[in-house]
C-alpha cells in the first residue's frame, strides 16, 4: 500500500543547493551524491526524474519499505546522502524538508507478502507501488541497486550504490528509512522486549535472544531461517 508520510516532528531548516551540476553539501574530503545523473537525463529531455530506494530487506520483522522522490532542482536540500551514513536526527530533519520541498511517495510490502513472494520480489513490489503513487507520474526513474523491478511503467536505470551517487536516490533512502524506523518504534510499543525501537527488526543479539525467550510475533518473517527455526523448533 502506498502512503503519505507520517506527521512531521517540527519544521527544520537546512541550506539548499540551488545549482544543478554540483555536489550538494559537498565537504572537503567527503564523497557525497550529486545531481550529475539527473542533469544528464534532463539534457536528454526528461523532466520528472524520480529516485527510488528501499529499506528493510535484512530484518527479521516488519515490512519492507520503498520511497520514490522527485526533487525540485532549484531546492535540493544540502546534506543528502546514503541514509546509513547520516545520524537519525539528521535523517529526521531531511525527511521533513523533503516532504515540504519535493514530491514524495512511500509504499510497503507486508510481512505476509514477503513470506509469500520472497524478500527480493517484495522489495520490488514496494518500489513499484511507490512509483505508481507519484502524481503526476515521473518520466524516468533512477533505481538503487543492479536490478529494475519488472512492474514499472516508465523508463528506468539501475544505479549500483545509487544512494551514494544520486541525490534523488539518497533522498528516497532517507525517506524510506525514516518511515520504517518510525514504524518499528510504534510496533515496539505493541510488542515490547524485542528492542525494535533500537534494532528496527534487524537480527541483533538482543532481538535473537528475545525471539528465543518471547517467541514469534505476527510481525516476524516466517520465511526467514532464524524465525522459521524458532517457530518450528528445528
Swiss-Prot record:
Record text on cofactor binding: Manganese or magnesium. Binds 1 divalent metal ion per monomer in the absence of substrate. May bind a second metal ion after substrate binding.
Keywords: Cytoplasm, Endonuclease, Hydrolase, Manganese, Metal-binding, Nuclease
SUPFAM superfamilies registered for this protein in UniProt: Ribonuclease H-like (SSF53098)
PROSITE patterns: RNASE_H_2 (PS51975)
Catalytic reaction(s) noted: Endonucleolytic cleavage to 5'-phosphomonoester
Gene Ontology annotations for the cellular component aspect, listed alphabetically: cytoplasm; ribonuclease H2 complex
Domain of life, per lineage: Bacteria
Protein name per its UniProtKB record: Ribonuclease HII
Provenance organism: Ruegeria pomeroyi (strain ATCC 700808 / DSM 15171 / DSS-3)
Protein's gene: rnhB
